[in-house]
């Protein structure tokens, strides 16, 4: 059985206190389901920066991810968070180039590339997000957009050490989900552009009801999950319902 990589992206949700409540609830679920979880998945949550410390020393095999990081190592960059700060909190993964960062904070492929390069130097695993808008999808430009984003974001990087998350923008938080075949086709294309060894996730309204069919696809190695990861019971159901 190939284990899937499940990363819950909490976005700007939850507080330090509610994160501790999540951990307590997940601890109870883990005691019942740990064998299944660990057989089927590697699992992590990307909490807001302020909540990472609440999960730092968990003994549940629950890995930590950050939602962004700076491409500067340290210095007078108010509001930025460095790779070393993340490492000190036992963070394993960092999400880069999420469509919401691109939309609201003018994130560019070039900056994603600089961040990913630094992450790899620091032994953090970057999760580089790519995906098309609804307009681009309807115009048949999905692969064209994804190819351009990957070319710039992964320039001169070891693609076998980078995780790529395909998140069609039209499916993020909308309740719309790409069909399993669409997701499979694009994830397969990403592997063709990068490497068969590159881990490719799908993200976009993934939940416990559709994850079985999606996880049955040959080239989908995991999932970047939003709202369905905020509650411990929902997060648990994701792993239990994997193929």
From Swiss-Prot:
Substrate binds at residues 9-11, 173, 205, 226-227. GO terms for molecular function: triose-phosphate isomerase activity. The keyword Transcription does not apply. One of its GO terms (cellular component) is cytosol. Belongs to the triosephosphate isomerase family. It catalyses: D-glyceraldehyde 3-phosphate = dihydroxyacetone phosphate. This is Triosephosphate isomerase. Involved in the gluconeogenesis. Catalyzes stereospecifically the conversion of dihydroxyacetone phosphate (DHAP) to D-glyceraldehyde-3-phosphate (G3P). GO terms for biological process: gluconeogenesis; glyceraldehyde-3-phosphate biosynthetic process; glycerol catabolic process; glycolytic process. The active site is at 98 (electrophile), 167 (proton acceptor). It comes from the Bacteria. Pathway: Carbohydrate biosynthesis; gluconeogenesis; Carbohydrate degradation; glycolysis; D-glyceraldehyde 3-phosphate from glycerone phosphate: step 1/1. Its EC number is 5.3.1.1. It is found in: Cytoplasm. The keyword Cell membrane does not apply. Homodimer. Keywords: Cytoplasm, Gluconeogenesis, Glycolysis, Isomerase.
